[in-house]
């Protein structure tokens, strides 16, 4: 009997082989961001310079923090975004709790201190933010008012109708402020403060950037805004000053994350690597002058360590149930 092995080998060699299919090329990158449009132009130019091939595939959708993250949650079953870029860390913490994010440790993220990163790498922080008073010098002089120096000052009747703030249900800045005052005063006293402050407000805006822009243009003498936005407006010639409240500064930081179920995960990871790089951080600093989570990039603004920052528990502030409760009560009391 002839051995069967040579025959089997011959038959195997005659069977046509089909190579394993190569992974499908990712031809898109969709980014959801809460950065303002004017600063995005600067950041995007740096991105195109550093990663032109990826930038050619990329697009971003810009919105205020609240609606942007609500959209991510609404799309959970069929994600349309690959990356979240420049969103307040409390919202990112909430998104991680809801299962909306995928862990990814971006290259160079080791240069970011641990307190500015999620312990399971759900997000990494990049830009630090502080809330201050945007005071239009010309307008406040015309009204013969002195600029407020503290949160307590804003309750003075002389400022009635001269203050603009934003809505915490749509603005990350406003929610940050709400949670910060809760931490500073305790919830009961915080609501008493907001009830008194509401009497002096002329307008409550949807966008957190609007109060600063309105102060810069002279539509209001006082806007409660992110300090870096006021500094940018001042550099561009607006008659505006930044005043940090003496009785405590609300602060947070923005971060980036990979969306769970992203359709273009490899492109997303390349972008996230870039977004914490020294080149990207330098572009953030060039526009904002604000402090960064990386300490190896110089900034023109004040150092966080030199400021009277409100002690805030970001995990608590980012808890969806806590946030929903505060925002719901604010809407019940102050919705216009």
Q: For the regions a protein language model found, what residue spans apply to each?
A:
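A bilobed periplasmic-binding-protein/Venus flytrap-type ligand-binding module shared by bacterial periplasmic
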Residues: 134-139, 179, 252-264, 283-284
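Short beta-strand->loop
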Residues: 32-35, 102-108, 119-126, 135-137, 143-144, 152, 221-222, ...
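Mature extracytoplasmic/periplasmic domains
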Residues: 259-315
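Early extracytoplasmic/lumenal segment of secretory-pathway proteins
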Residues: 25-94
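Extracellular/periplasmic bilobal clamshell ligand-binding domains
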Residues: 301-336
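Ligand-binding pocket segment of bilobal, Venus flytrap-like solute-binding proteins
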Residues: 170-247
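A structural signal for short loop-to-beta-strand junctions that line the ligand-binding cleft
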Residues: 79-84, 102-134, 152, 161-165
């Amino acid at each position: 009997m002839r051995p069967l092995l040579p025959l089997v080998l011959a038959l195997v060699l005659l069977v046509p082989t089909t190579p394993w299919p190569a992974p499908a090329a990712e031809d898109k990158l969709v980014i959801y961001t809460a950065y303002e449009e004017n600063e995005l132009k600067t950041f995007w130019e740096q991105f195109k310079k550093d990663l032109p091939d990826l930038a050619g595939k990329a697009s971003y959708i810009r919105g205020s923090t609240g609606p942007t993250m609500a959209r991510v949650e609404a799309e959970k079953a069929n994600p349309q975004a690959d990356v979240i870029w420049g969103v307040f860390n409390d919202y990112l913490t909430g998104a991680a709790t809801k299962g909306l994010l995928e862990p990814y440790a971006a290259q160079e993220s080791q240069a970011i201190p641990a307190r500015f990163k999620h312990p399971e790498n759900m997000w990494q922080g990049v830009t630090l933010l502080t809330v201050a008073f945007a005071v239009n010098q010309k307008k406040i002089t015309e009204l013969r008012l002195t600029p407020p120096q503290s949160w307590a000052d804003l309750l003075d009747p002389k400022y009635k109708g001269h203050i603009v703030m934003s809505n915490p249900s749509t603005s990350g800045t406003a929610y940050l402020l709400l949670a910060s005052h809760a931490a500073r005063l305790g919830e009961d006293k915080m609501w008493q403060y907001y009830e008194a402050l509401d009497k002096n407000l002329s307008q409550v805006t949807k966008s957190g950037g609007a109060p600063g822009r309105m102060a810069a243009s002279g539509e209001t003498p006082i806007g409660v805004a992110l300090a870096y936005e006021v500094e940018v407006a001042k550099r561009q010639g607006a008659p505006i000053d930044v005043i940090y409240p003496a009785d405590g500064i609300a602060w947070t930081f923005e971060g980036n994350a990979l969306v769970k179920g992203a359709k273009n995960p490899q492109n997303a990871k390349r972008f996230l690597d870039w977004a914490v790089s020294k080149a990207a951080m330098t572009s953030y600093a060039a526009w904002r002058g604000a402090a960064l989570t990386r300490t190896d990039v110089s900034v023109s603004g004040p150092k966080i360590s030199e400021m009277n920052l409100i002690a805030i528990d970001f995990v608590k502030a980012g808890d969806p149930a806590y946030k929903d409760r505060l925002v719901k009560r604010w809407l019940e009391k102050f919705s216009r």
